[in-house]
């Protein structure tokens, strides 16, 4: 009996060392103009700078929230002057209350 030749088994070879450098956008062929306009796509991320930026933006948002909260508290206050000339802060009252 003749046996049919066995089909070659497809072996998945591990990627070669030179192929690993072509992962992501760094391996895509682009023009020099595109790389000059979009350098952040091709530069390795700098984690300390990213952490500094995240902390800075978080502090800015917290400060804006703080200013908003203090402005809301001051909105209902006005400076009143008594008969002796002393000024003090007084909460606004409505005639309808």
Swiss-Prot record:
Per the record, membrane topology reads: Single-pass membrane protein
Superkingdom of origin organism: Eukaryota
Q: Which GO terms describe its cellular component?
A: membrane
Q: Which UniProt keywords apply?
A: Membrane, Transmembrane, Transmembrane helix
Location in or out of the cell: Membrane
Region (Disordered) location: 1-22
Q: Which residues cross the membrane?
A: 48-70
Q: Name one Pfam family in it.
A: DUF4500
Q: Which PANTHER family match?
A: SMALL INTEGRAL MEMBRANE PROTEIN 8
What is the protein's name according to its record?
Small integral membrane protein 8
State the organism named in the record. Answer: Bos taurus
């Amino acid at each position: 009996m003749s046996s049919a030749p066995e089909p070659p088994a497809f072996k998945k070879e591990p990627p070669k060392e030179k192929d690993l450098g072509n992962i992501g956008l760094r391996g895509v062929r682009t023009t020099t103009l595109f790389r000059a306009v979009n350098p952040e796509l091709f530069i390795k991320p700098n984690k300390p700078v990213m952490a500094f930026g995240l902390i800075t933006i978080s502090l800015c948002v917290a400060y804006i929230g703080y200013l908003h909260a203090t402005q809301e508290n001051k909105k209902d206050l006005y400076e009143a002057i008594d008969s002796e000339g002393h000024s003090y802060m007084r909460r606004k009252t409505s005639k309808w209350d």
